[in-house]
Amino acid sequence: MSRAPLPLRDDERLIFALDVPDRVQALDWVERLGDSVAFYKIGMELLASGEYFQVLDELARRDKRVFVDLKFFDIPATAAAVIKRLSQWPVSYATIHGWHPAMMEACAAANSSDMRLLAVTVLTSMGRPDLAQMGIDREPVDVVVERALAAQAAGIDGVIASGQEAGPIRAATGAGFSIVCPGIRPGGPVGDDQKRTVGVAQAFADGADAIVIGRPIRLAADPQAAARAIQQEIASALAAR
């Protein structure tokens, strides 16, 4: 059975994508952002450095929440073994693929901590033509909602999905299911590789629990000021819903 969304403070609903190649740069960003960011996503680029779990420990020591975004996908027994080990670390969110019901059920059963598992639905860099190339000739929203319902039935705690699909997911799954939205663009589309993007206020109005933002903060002239501006927008959006 899916567990209720994490009891997040408003400032923990902004997750910064720590997309850097090594520990030194990761911790430099944590210092630069200070208390403007309380939640960090660490992914595949950092894993390749061999310093992934050192960074995870450092974040936990600084009282930051951690989102492990490694999109685990394997046979059920192997994926479950990974989740069992990962649940021993101070992790708030972790991603698995949302394509395999038996694997999702095994992962849900193996999670022995407060970590919430999020199923990856359709990457925000993909549109309908990309799905068609994979043999799925359907609109992304239909695939996302179908996978969200399958994840919920398997006992997974939520999904990671475009803010464009947050409303349909919330309508289909109800209030007790976590929705985390990447590809958020506070100032609108910026012409990068993200195709299905929305703004901060829209994501929360449609039911998102948290958002993931990387480049709009990282590439800002003043990253801490950019993060604080997003925090203010989140607070306003939450107050309005």
Curated annotation (Swiss-Prot):
Gene3D superfamilies: Aldolase class I. Keywords: Decarboxylase, Lyase, Pyrimidine biosynthesis. GO terms for cellular component: cytosol. GO terms for biological process: 'de novo' pyrimidine nucleobase biosynthetic process; 'de novo' UMP biosynthetic process. InterPro entries: Aldolase_TIM (IPR013785), OMPdecase (IPR014732), OMPdecase_AS (IPR018089), OMPdecase_bac (IPR047596), OMPdeCOase_dom (IPR001754), RibuloseP-bd_barrel (IPR011060). It comes from the Bacteria. Belongs to the OMP decarboxylase family. Type 1 subfamily. Homodimer. This is Orotidine 5'-phosphate decarboxylase.
